[in-house]
From Swiss-Prot:
GO annotation, cellular component aspect: MLL1 complex; transcription factor TFIID complex
Cofactor(s) annotated in UniProt: Mg(2+)
Modified how: Phosphorylated by casein kinase II in vitro.
EC code(s) of this entry: 2.3.1.48, 2.7.11.1
Gene3D superfamilies: Bromodomain-like (1.20.920.10), TAFII-230 TBP-binding domain (1.10.1100.10)
Name of protein: Transcription initiation factor TFIID subunit 1
Record CDD domains: Bromo_TFIID
Residues where Phosphoserine is found: S131, S302, S1664, S1667, S1773, S1776, S1794, S1821
Phylogenetic placement of the source organism: Eukaryota, Metazoa, Chordata, Craniata, Vertebrata
Length: 1865
């Protein structure tokens, strides 16, 4: 055995094949065996005689024959051979074998294990010399026979064989030290063949050694082992030091180095080396070892640590010693053989190992290299001598010396300005001024560079990427200079793709899209600016720092694969848990779907009683008879049945047995019985009778030592790692569950009270048995999807169920051939049509019409009836249960009022959109919940968890409603969503946040000062936003307004989802497993439940937010305080009847107003025709709508909200009114047009026509080119208004004329001929269409139409003087609030014009005067004053003046009372007082109009209070809506037959508005009439009657509250009435004294006259709706009537009328707009409803019914009939009180009092106030009135409705902020 000098060295030794004989004088043979028994002397013998005797020494020497001494023999022989036998060394340095050599092949037996390791290590190393023949040598031919049997040698790598060599060998400076076994492993079959030379001798390298004489004198031990010290303890580590015989641990680390690149060494080198070897050997001492030089680094094994830390190499490139052994047995495959060029290699027939493939190259003839080199050197030397330059210097081969780069240097830009620079070089060199790029910006744009320098993108060098193979590889060796004279045969390279190579693009890079190619994207800008803030946020721990990801090196899970984790990962939890067996065996009747258990048809009653069967009466049997019935105990029967079953089981051989085989086995009279109470009212899936369920006990082990699952009375224990429920089990927790193919549901065992027992009732009698246990079943986790109504699955089930029924009928048939009747099937399936049944029957049977089987369906002879197993497979019991669940839920929805279309199952692709739109009731249907749950379990979506589908309704269950996986679109109601553009301009707008405040916020958030100083403004803002968002998410943070949405990542969203699921799961477990006896008081129990939920959420918040319990309790107390405060405020304004609304309001307002992305759910209670209530839920997601709703709900009262809800109908009424107004305008316009037509067109001046139009203009009227439709040259210019002369269609001549005008004949571009094609111009086709269209129009002149009735103006002489200046008919009534505001604003303007008032014009600037707002708490200025005026905040002068005084007080406080600014403010106040005094009368009237309670008329105040009572109290009674309006005759036809005098609240309000009630008694009579009518029609026990009684009670109660005030008003009214009567009597005595009703001569109605009636005139108001007085007039009634009939309704002709109108009162003038505003009459009606007290505003009406009569005349009988029918008068209380009326005051605005009476007067209805009566100067004819009535209903009704609509529209406007009224509550 050979000992290498070091373990990794490749030192070579020259072996000798001669060994000297032992020298007898040396003391015997040198034996290593002596080492085993003591020290050895210099001769190699044991020292001393004391240890062993001679006999033992002889035995030891005999052991040497076993080969222990052969090591020394080999070593010494090696050196001697070099000295004595140098001539035997052949050309290549190896030793020739001798014929007399002895074979010592058994020397390896001593250290066999070591040699094996050694051979593997040496085989993995490469020799120093790179010879192609290296692998062809064999080092040990003696062992070849044995080793070849054990391990067949692999095929050799390709390489040329040198024929001129006699023996094989390998040449090198040093011979590689390799063992025999290693060389064999490296040797192929060809090498083995070559190893036997021509003469049949073994010519292997070691053969010579073995055949040499081994009896030579051995050297001394000290020569062999320099560390040996005689007489001392042997130091084996030094003797056999490291590397001497140490096995190599990393034996195969470098096996991947291929040997194919070794180059053959030239002959001359070989010869030189031979000589040097011989010289060295001769000079060496025999025992001087020739150690190898230190090996180069690439040949050394790497350190263990480096190897461990290095990146993992591919499994294929890394091989171990074990794999080597396996691979050696297989034929080797060249790596390149099966690469991309495999096809070509297959075509060329290249073998797998690639041997012999040479590309067709030929080796060159070996020429002595020195000769070549000499020739080259001589040439170069000659050149050097001639030039005097060293051409072979290293500098000459640098790139810098090879290129003429100096020529490309631009010394002066002017020189190259005209030249075009090379684009590639120009882009790398940077900007140079040229004609194309005059400046750097233009250059950057041209190059496509981004202008920003701080772009956060990967940095790239401007220079091309270095190719490492070109720089560092020996690529020049692979250049083929001559294919016929190759220095070596090239091997095909192996294609390797380096993922680190930047030239390779192995995947599509993830680049952010840029908006434009030239401008940097917004994202990049954001990233660059937010980089610093991100670093800071990472430091403060708000966001996690993102790890630097290297895209080219994906992270490896487990580089060393130490743990095999991937084999231990738990399986993803699917739908059906794989915990234990889940084979459910139903009873035989259930599997066969037998009738009573699986009904074929269920009617509505059965469906409503689904799984809740009522006790039915028996028609026969013992229980059908009355009388006492005995109750039988079942104890004996149970034991008897158990014994029978046990005997049956024993008889069948023991083991498990299935007993549920017949319907009788399914009785509850025997066996064990448990009760299960389902917590869900209507579970999504329920089992039918006879279906089986397993009880499973899920147990999660504790970590570490687990005691095991606790024993349970029922069920099998299943150990689960992942939870089969939505929440996970805690370690050590056991949860029992029902599990079957339909659902899995947790169950909770409860002890049955001892007092409870079970009664079983059959036809025969009653039976009693004990109950032991009861389970509460939690919420189901569906495993089976319920089909949707009319879905494909549902229809398929119906079809299959019918088919199965038919098959079973055939099986039951005893006839041959089998036959059944259609009637049997129809009886079972009454809902199926006969055609559908026939369709199923035709598949398997034929209908026989004659013969024995007539009217029977007979089974087809060729049809095979399915077997029982096949029938069972067609329809499973689970499918039936799902179908029953679907139809039961469908019935429930139908009962709730949902139509069939509302709960169709959606298509899969539109499902998520569909989920958002369907109603909540439908969303909870089982087909939706089961589909959602199953999809969520498959990971397709998430569940809403809390919401409408929660079966408990109190947050203790899961809501199975789909929401998307990603945190977009809809989320939980509690999670805020970002809504765009809602913070712009508000104080939450981050752009308005100053830097100082932002930094202050950061300090509050705990950011260090030094970090804040480093940030720029927008980085500070970014940190504020991020930290605010983070705190808002966790529920903290006072500055939540700066939070921006809930931009959760998907991972965060999933985490929150899991947490919420776990919370509800734990809560459900806690509640359902609780053994507390719950109180019957539902309120307290629900409060406790909410406490549980709140505790759970508090704990969760404490964990999430790191808040202490004291902080949480403080926050909760604060919330409760605010809630209490809000409730107290609400209680002040709302009545007791509104309390049910508070919860709604609270739930609405509890939504965080600053949070975005809210979802508002409004639950509305409706009542159907039968009086049954049902609830519907509306979901609102628009933030603007939510805000408006919340604001109205919190600030407005019920009356307002009711009107607000009814706005749609009122809006429609307004539209009708608007339509009438527009029709009136059109009528007037038409008349004006007709007048213009009569005048005729003006004469045209003849002008020269241009031959060709200059411009390419096209007329829109006639289509001609060269002019526009407004041009007078257009032939149709004057025809637009005038009717055409032809009465009907155009003649042909006219059409031709039209064509000439439309198309110019000389326009050659209209038609083009291109080859065989004719191209028609677009203009030609358009003009042809125009001609065709115009020719089809039929035109009739106005003169030929039937004449319309025209209103004739009065022609009487005595009326001529009544002509007055023209005024518009539609005089706009002005809101008194607007008038007041305009007066106040004019006063403000006057004050602004005062000198030196500038400091008071705008608010004080806090930056300029820093301490102002600390001193002044209520600042005020003229600008704020003006804004308040425009907002209608001042209904009276006092409030306005109070705010103005505040300016003076503030100035005195801050500047001092004597300061000049205070004096200026005082002058402003003085001016204001002066102006207010000037307009005192007008302002007083306006204030009264605004606030009726300020009115002098007691009747108005009395009516005002009564109306308040009706609207705010009586109408607010819950469910009082049937009494709000008159009963609809369409819906209740017989009502008016039963009820003679109907009454309702709306009618009462109308009576109030007409001031019909002067006392409470008359008011209460009508209120009591409502109750009396209800009793009469509905009965005293009706719910309606109870509601009516409640209305009456509320009325009496409220009247009692106002008793004192109403009593005083009644007295005042009575006094006024008496005074008026007295005055009337006095006036009747003196007929010449003009009274209010004395007919006045026409000349009294002078323009300057202003007539007014005292307020006491109202006492004449008639109670009998007959308020029209017959007052004689100068104008006869007959004449007026005639005028009315002849009128044409033309309102523009009023100036021609002869009836002069009397002047209105002062108030009327005040409320009318100025003449300048009359022009805005088109918009007038929009504001007509602004004033609920606008009855006093007696301008002309905007509706047709408001058109007045010519003068005062009695009402026509037709109108009176209408009035009687409508229950109201046609006039609308045309009472004028001087200074009366006006708007409701601000304080009463919310009450929304609707005064129908305060409307425009009807001029036809002449009440006591004659001063305003005759206003219109014309009449509406009866015909027109009839026409209008047909179009818009009776005029009276439209007016009344209009008045209410106007009020409500005003209210609505006030909410929206568009009204003139005050909207700031």
């Amino acid at each position: 055995m050979l000992l290498p000098a070091t373990g990794a060295s490749r030192s070579a030794a020259i072996m000798s094949d001669t060994d000297s004989d032992e020298d007898s004088s040396g003391g015997g043979p040198f034996s290593l065996t002596g080492f085993l028994f003591g020290n050895i002397n210099g001769a190699g013998q044991l020292e001393g005689e004391s240890v062993l005797d001679d006999e033992c020494k002889k035995h030891l020497a005999g052991l040497g024959a076993l080969g222990l001494g052969s090591l020394i023999t080999e070593l010494t022989a090696n050196e001697e051979l070099a000295g004595t036998d140098g001539a035997l060394v052949n050309d290549e340095g190896w030793i020739r074998s001798r014929e007399d050599a002895v074979d010592y092949s058994d020397i390896n037996e001593v250290a066999e294990d070591e040699s094996r390791r050694y051979q593997q290590t040496m085989g993995s190393l490469q020799p120093l010399c790179h010879s192609a023949d290296y692998d062809e040598d064999d080092y040990d031919a003696d062992c070849e026979d044995i080793d070849c049997k054990l391990m067949p040698p692999p095929p050799p790598p390709p390489g040329p064989v040198k024929k001129e060599k006699d023996q094989d060998g390998l040449t090198g400076e040093k011979v590689d030290f390799s063992s025999s076994s290693d060389s064999e492993s490296e040797m192929g079959p060809q090498e083995a063949a070559q190893a036997e030379s021509k003469d049949g001798k073994l010519t292997l390298p070691l053969a010579g050694i073995m055949q040499h004489d081994a009896t030579k004198l051995l050297p001394s031990v000290t020569e062999l082992f320099p560390e040996f010290r005689p007489g001392k303890v042997l130091r084996f580590l030094r003797l056999f030091g490291p590397g001497k015989n140490v096995p190599s641990v990393w034996r195969s680390a470098r096996r991947k180095r291929k040997k194919k690149h070794r180059e053959p060494i030239q002959e001359e080198q070989i010869q030189e080396e031979e000589c040097s070897v011989e010289l060295e050997v001769n000079q060496k001492s025999l025992w001087n070892y020739d150690y190898a030089p230190p090996p180069p680094p690439e040949q050394c094994l790497s350190d263990d640590e480096i190897t461990m830390m290095a990146p993992v190499e591919s499994k294929f490139s890394q091989s171990t010693g074990d794999t080597d052994k396996v691979m050696d047995t297989k034929p080797r495959v060249a790596e390149w053989r099966y690469g991309p060029a495999r096809l070509w290699y297959d075509m060329l027939g290249v073998p797998e190992d690639g041997s012999g493939f040479d590309y067709g190259f030929k080796m060159r003839k070996t020429e002595h290299e020195p000769a070549i080199k000499c020739k080259m050197m001589t040439k170069l030397r000659k050149l050097e001598e001639s030039n005097g330059i060293d051409l072979l210097a290293d500098e000459n081969f640098l790139m810098v010396t090879q290129l003429h780069w100096e020529d490309d240097i631009i010394w002066d830009g002017e020189d190259v300005k005209h030249k075009g620079t090379k684009p590639q070089r120009a882009s790398l060199a940077g900007w140079l001024p040229s004609s194309m790029t005059r400046n750097a910006m233009a250059y950057n744009v041209q190059q496509g560079f981004a202008a920003t320098l701080d772009d956060d993108k990967p940095w790239y060098s401007i220079f091309p990427i270095d190719n490492e193979d070109l720089v560092y590889g020996r690529w020049e060796d692979n250049i083929i200079w001559d294919a016929q004279a190759m220095p070596r045969i090239l091997e095909p390279p192996v294609l390797t793709l380096d993922p680190n190579d930047e030239n390779l693009i192995l995947e599509i890079p993830d680049e952010k899209e840029e908006a434009t190619s030239n401008s940097p994207s917004k994202e990049n800008k954001k990233e660059s600016s937010l980089k610093k803030s991100r670093i800071l946020l990472g430091k403060t721990g708000v966001i996690k720092e993102e790890p630097q990801q290297n895209m080219s090196q994906p992270e490896v899970k487990d580089p060393w694969n130490l743990s095999n984790d991937e084999y231990y990962y738990p399986k993803q939890q699917g739908l059906r848990g794989t915990f234990g067996g889940n084979i459910i065996q139903h009873s035989i009747p259930a599997v066969e779907l037998r009738q009573p258990f699986f009904p074929t048809h269920m009617g509505p009653i059965k469906l409503r009683q689904f799984h809740r069967p009522p006790l039915k009466k028996y028609s026969f049997g013992a229980l059908s008879q009355p009388g006492p019935h005995s109750v039988q105990p079942l104890l004996k029967h149970i034991k008897k049945k158990a014994k029978m079953r046990e005997q049956e089981r024993q008889a069948s051989g023991g083991g498990e047995m299935f007993f549920m085989r017949t319907p009788q086995d399914l009785t509850g009279k025997d066996g064990d019985l448990i009760l299960a109470e389902y917590s869900e009212e209507n579970g999504p899936l329920m089992m039918q009778v006879g279906m089986a369920t397993k009880i499973k006990n899920y147990y999660k082990r504790k970590p570490g030592k687990d005691p095991g699952a606790p024993d349970c009375k029922y069920g099998e224990t299943v150990y689960c790692h992942t939870s089969p429920f939505l929440g996970s089990l805690h370690p050590g927790q056991l949860l029992q569950a029902f599990e079957n193919n339909l659902f899995r549901a947790p169950i909770y065992l409860h002890k049955m009270p001892e007092t409870d027992f079970l009664i079983i009732r059959t036809r025969q009698g009653y039976y009693i048995r004990e109950l032991v246990d009861i389970f509460v079943v939690g919420q189901q986790c569906p495993l089976f999807e319920v089909p949707g109504p009319n879905s494909k699955r549902a229809n398929t089930h119906i079809r299959d169920f019918l088919q199965v029924f038919i098959y079973r009928l055939f099986w039951k048939s005893k006839d041959r051939p089998r036959r059944i009747r259609m009637e049997d099937i129809k009886k079972a399936f009454p809902s199926h049509s006969e055609s559908s049944i026939r369709k199923r029957l035709k598949l398997c049977a034929d209908f026989k019409r004659t013969g024995m089987d007539s009217n029977w369906w007979v089974l087809k002879s060729d049809f095979r009836l399915p077997t029982e197993e096949e029938i069972r497979a067609m329809v499973s019991p689970e499918q039936c249960c799902a179908y029953y669940s679907m139809i039961a839920a469908e019935q429930r929805l139908k009962d709730a009022g949902y139509g069939e279309k509302s709960f169709f199952a959606p298509e899969e692709e539109n499902e998520e959109d569909f989920q958002m739109k369907i109603d909540d009731e439908v969303r909870t249907a089982p087909w939706n919940t089961t589909r959602a749950f199953i999809a969520a379990m498959k990971g397709k979506c998430l569940l809403e968890v809390t919401g409408v589908a929660d079966p408990t309704g109190c947050g203790e269950g899961f809501s199975y409603v789909k929401i998307p996986n990603k945190p977009t679109q809809q989320k939980d109601d509690k999670e805020p969503q970002p809504v765009k553009k809602t913070v712009t301009g508000t104080d939450a707008d981050l752009r308005r946040l100053s830097l100082k405040n932002a930094k202050q916020l950061l300090r509050k958030f705990g950011v260090p000062e030094e970090e804040i100083k480093k940030l720029s403004r927008w980085e500070v803002i970014d940190v504020v936003r991020t930290m605010s968002t983070e705190q808002a998410r966790s529920g903290e943070g006072p500055m939540s307004k700066f939070a921006r949405g809930s931009r959760f990542s998907v991972a965060e969203h999933q985490e929150r989802y899991k947490e919420e699921c776990q919370r509800i799961f734990d809560l459900q477990n806690k509640v359902l497993s609780s053994t507390e006896v719950l109180s019957t008081d539902t309120d307290s129990s629900s409060a406790e439940d909410s406490d549980f939920e709140e505790m759970g959420k508090n704990i969760e918040n404490m964990l999430q937010n790191k808040k202490t319990s004291s902080q949480l309790s403080r926050e909760r107390e604060e919330q409760e305080r605010k809630e209490l405060q809000r409730m107290l405020l609400a209680a002040g304004s709302a009545s007791a009847g509104n309390n049910h609304r508070d919860d709604d309001t609270a739930s609405v307002t509890s939504l965080n107003s600053s949070a975005t992305g809210r979802c508002l759910k409004i639950y509305r209670t409706f009542r159907d025709e039968e009086g049954k209530e049902y609830v519907r839920c509306e979901t609102v997601r628009k933030p603007a709508v939510i805000d408006a709703y919340v604001r109205i709900r919190t600030t407005k009262d019920e009356e307002f909200i009711r009107k607000f809800a009814l706005f749609d109908e009122q809006h429609r009424e307004e539209m009708r009114k608007e339509r009438r107004r527009i029709q009136e305008q059109l009528r007037r316009l038409k008349r004006n047009q007709e007048k213009e037509k009569l005048k005729g067109p003006p004469e045209k001046k003849p002008k020269k026509m241009k031959e060709r139009p200059d411009l390419k203009l096209k007329c829109g009227a006639c289509g001609a080119i060269g002019h526009m439709r407004t041009n007078k040259f257009c032939p149709l210019y004057y025809q637009t208004n005038a009717p055409p002369s032809n009465p009907v269609a155009m003649t042909e001549e006219q059409e031709e004329e039209l064509e000439k005008t439309v198309i110019h004949n000389d326009n050659e571009e209209l038609i083009k001929v291109e080859g065989t094609k004719i191209v028609l111009g677009k203009q030609l086709i358009e003009s042809a269409d125009e001609v065709r269209r115009k020719s089809l129009v039929l035109k009739f002149p106005k003169q030929q139409l039937p004449p319309k009735k025209k209103r004739r103006v009065g022609t009487t002489v005595h009326c001529d003087y009544l002509n007055r200046p023209h005024k518009s008919i539609h005089r706009r009534r002005t809101d008194p609030m607007v008038t007041l505001s305009s007066i106040l604003e004019s006063i403000i303007n006057d004050m602004r014009d005062l000198p030196n008032t500038y400091p008071f014009h705008t608010p004080v600037n806090a930056k300029v005067v820093k301490d102002y707002y600390k001193i002044i708490t209520r600042p005020m200025d003229l600008q704020t004053l003006r804004e308040n005026v425009r907002k209608r905040l001042y209904p009276s002068r006092e409030e306005f003046r109070e705010h103005l005084e505040l300016i003076v007080k503030n100035s005195a406080t801050y500047n001092g009372p004597k300061h000049s600014l205070t004096q200026i403010s005082q002058s402003m106040l003085d001016l204001c007082d002066e102006k207010l005094k000037e307009k005192e009368d007008k302002l007083a009237r306006l204030e009264k109009a605004i606030n009726p309670l300020l009115d002098d008329d007691d009747q108005v105040a009395f009516s005002f209070i009564l109306d308040n009572i009706v609207t705010q109290k009586m109408m607010a009674v819950p469910d009082s809506w049937p009494f709000h309006h008159p009963v609809n005759k369409k819906f209740v036809p017989d009502y008016y037959k039963v009820i003679v005098s109907p009454m309702d609240l709306e009618t009462i309000r109308k009576n109030i508005s007409k001031h019909k009630y002067q006392s409470r008694e008359s008011f209460l009579d009508d209120v009591n009439l409502i109750l009396a009518n209800s009793v009469k029609y509905n009965g005293s026990e009706s719910q309606y009657t109870k509601t009516a009684q409640e209305i009456v009670n509320v009325c009496y109660q409220t009247l009692t509250e106002y008793d004192e005030h109403l009593t005083q008003l009644e007295k005042d009214i009575c006094t006024a009435k008496e005074a008026a009567l007295e005055e009337a009597e006095l006036e009747s005595l003196d007929p010449m004294t003009p009274g209010p009703y004395t007919p006045q001569p026409p000349d009294l109605y002078d323009n300057s006259t202003s007539l007014s009636v005292s307020r006491d005139a109202s006492v004449y108001q008639d109670e009998s709706n007959m308020s029209v007085l017959d007052i004689p007039s100068a104008t006869s009634e007959k004449q007026l009537t005639q005028e009315g009939e002849d009128g044409d309704g033309d309102l523009a002709d009023e100036e021609e009328g002869t009836v002069q109108q009397p002047q209105a009162s002062v108030l009327y003038e005040d409320l009318l707009m100025s003449e300048g505003e009359d022009d805005e009459e088109d918009a007038g009606s929009d504001e007509e409803g602004d004033n609920p007290f606008s009855a006093i505003q007696l301008s002309e009406s905007g509706s047709d019914s408001d058109v007045g009569s010519g003068s005062i005349r009695p009402k026509q009988p037709r109108v009176l009939q209408e009035n009687t029918r409508m229950g109201m008068e046609n006039e609308e209380s045309m009472m004028s009180y001087e200074g009366d009326g006006g708007e409701v005051s601000r304080g009463l605005e919310d009450s929304n009092i609707s005064y129908g009476s305060y409307e425009e007067p009807d001029p036809k209805s002449n009440t006591q106030d004659t001063s305003f009566s005759s206003i219109g100067g014309y009449e509406v004819s009866e015909e027109e009135e009839d026409e209008e009535e047909q179009r818009s209903g009776p005029s009276v009704l439209s007016q009344v409705h209009l008045s209410e609509d106007e009020e409500d529209s005003e209210d609505f406007h006030s909410i929206a902020g568009d009204s003139d009224m005050d909207s700031d509550e």
